[in-house]
């Protein structure tokens, strides 16, 4: 008897199960519809942080073409990117000022979000400073938006709970940057540059305990999309 082979793309296609002997299920990402534009390409730089995979997973969940890349990869070997995330890590950036090739990545003309160590490195690279925190933070903390919260905090409450895990912190905001969020223990919980393409977060939006972390990733994705459409 002749077998009928059907391929089912999740979310989009159904089949007549009675006439089909074999069914192959293929997960289709939300961006893969026939009329959709190509997905945004935003990679995550692995700086040795314990939650780097969560950043990658969040981007993928939100429909982004994303990979985790080592921070030693030369710029010449990067994909054509719409955005980049500099992850957190064990490196004491406030003491060493070093973080792989992240300095070279910051020369790229794309939106970049630094998280924890990535945030601290960004501050130092652009002329600010990071130092050992007087009160290291580990666990849930409450932050308050300042200066309107900037683009990353768009459509999130003025006061919210986030997840912290840091020994160092930004002590001096770079020229051309402004603070977007603060807490009682850390003045620079968030920062953004005046050009609107460099962003830093001291806390970890990728951790579930950060109430509006997904919103922040979505806001960054929208920034990357707008930047691509302008090119």
Residue ranges with predicted function:
Residues 39-45, 49-115, 119-120, 126, ...:
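Flexible gly/pro-rich beta->alpha loop and the following alpha-helix that scaffold active-site loops
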Residues 228-231:
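Short, flexible loop/turn segments with low-complexity composition
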Residues 2-4, 30:
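Cationic, low-complexity basic patches in intrinsically disordered or flexible, solvent-exposed regions
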Residues 99-115, 120-215, 219-223:
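Pocket-forming structural segment of enzyme catalytic cores
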Residues 35-36:
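Eukaryotic N-terminal low-complexity, Ser/Thr- and Lys/Arg-rich leader segments
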